[in-house]
Amino acid sequence: MQPFTCHTGLAVMIDSANIDTDQIIPKQFLSKVTRDGFGVHLFHDWRYLDDAGDVPNPEFTLNKPRYNGASILLAQENFGCGSSREHAPWALADFGLRAIIAPSFADIFYGNSINNGLLPVKLSANEVRQLMDEVASEEGAQITVDLTTCQVTSPSGAQFSFSLAESARHKLLNGLDAIGLTLSHGAQISEYESQIPSWRR
């Protein structure tokens, strides 16, 4: 998993609340269990005018040329609500997004994102609104998300602080998912197991 330390990227916004996981990645695309290949289906029902996904919706934000290559998504409260499908952060990451900034997230989506290297950043509603206004007013506007200092820098240079549990921050900074975190303690695990009496093994 790619570590997340500090990322500066083109920002795009979806100015909606309660964006659920079925909107992020509709159920008909959940047949795979590998993480790749979901980006093309991200926000399928909004991005495309047809079921096959051959006709892009020119009015949808992510389809507008000015946001091509965006890696930071701004949204409103309760992002990622709905089902617990891990495919949602898979699709967002496969599309090329590194961070999602919103006032709040659904709990399960929040945890799934961290476990898949996607940084969910909680800012106040007013701070998110300022970021959205700046991104809308300037083509090519970039935002910096620095996990080492837990700060977001807006296109105009305004800085906003955010918090993240230290355990989650450690995993993201070091590119560790739950399995990777366990393996990083391999020596201690082996030492502990070597001390277990044979009759208990």
UniProtKB/Swiss-Prot annotation:
Any GO MF annotation of the entry: 3-isopropylmalate dehydratase activity
Listed SUPFAM superfamilies: LeuD/IlvD-like (SSF52016)
Domain of life: Bacteria
An individual GO BP term: L-leucine biosynthetic process
Protein's UniProt keywords contain Lyase: yes
Swiss-Prot/TrEMBL keywords: Amino-acid biosynthesis, Branched-chain amino acid biosynthesis, Leucine biosynthesis, Lyase
Catalysed conversion reaction: (2R,3S)-3-isopropylmalate = (2S)-2-isopropylmalate
Enzyme Commission numbers on file: 4.2.1.33
Pfam families: Aconitase_C (PF00694)
InterPro entries referenced in this protein's UniProt entry, alphabetically: 3-IsopropMal_deHydase_ssu, Aconitase/3IPM_dehydase_swvl, AconitaseA/IPMdHydase_ssu_swvl, IPMI_Swivel, LeuD
Pathway noted in the entry: Amino-acid biosynthesis; L-leucine biosynthesis; L-leucine from 3-methyl-2-oxobutanoate: step 2/4
Gene3D superfamilies linked to this entry: Aconitase, domain 4
One GO cellular component term: 3-isopropylmalate dehydratase complex
NCBIfam families per UniProt: leuD, PRK01641.1
Stated role: Catalyzes the isomerization between 2-isopropylmalate and 3-isopropylmalate, via the formation of 2-isopropylmaleate.
Similarity comment: family membership: Belongs to the LeuD family. LeuD type 1 subfamily.
Quaternary data: Heterodimer of LeuC and LeuD.
Protein name: 3-isopropylmalate dehydratase small subunit
Organism field: Shewanella oneidensis (strain ATCC 700550 / JCM 31522 / CIP 106686 / LMG 19005 / NCIMB 14063 / MR-1)
